[in-house]
Amino acid sequence: MPNIKSAIKRVRTTENAEARNISQKNAMRTAVKNAKTAINNNADNKAELVNFAIKSVDKASQSNLIHSNKADRIKSQLMSSSK
């Protein structure tokens, strides 16, 4: 446990950022999973879910939660399987 006031504040800030990042990453994973399920089941709203998943992947990539190449790979897989 840090003793210096600024270090204590930094720990608190880091915990908040970590919680926010984990939440956003989990939301992205859920969106991708829902899109893949819709594609496999040939659901009516699969295009809508794929667009939402791509949007969430792009946001995660911009926030440096995932590497840009991984984001491109996920988007490519979604687009190719949705056709």
UniProtKB/Swiss-Prot annotation:
Keyword RNA-binding: yes
Keywords for the protein's UniProt record, in alphabetical order: Ribonucleoprotein, Ribosomal protein, RNA-binding, rRNA-binding
Gene3D superfamilies from the UniProt entry: Ribosomal protein S20
Keyword flag Thylakoid: no
GO biological process assignments: translation
One of the record's GO molecular function terms: small ribosomal subunit rRNA binding
Gene Ontology cellular component terms for the protein in this record: cytosol; small ribosomal subunit
Superkingdom, natural source: Bacteria
InterPro entries hit by this protein: Ribosomal_bS20, Ribosomal_bS20_sf
Positions of disulphide bridges: none
Family per similarity comment: Belongs to the bacterial ribosomal protein bS20 family.
HAMAP family assigned: Ribosomal_bS20 (MF_00500)
Function, as annotated: Binds directly to 16S ribosomal RNA.
Name assigned to this protein: Small ribosomal subunit protein bS20
Protein's gene: rpsT
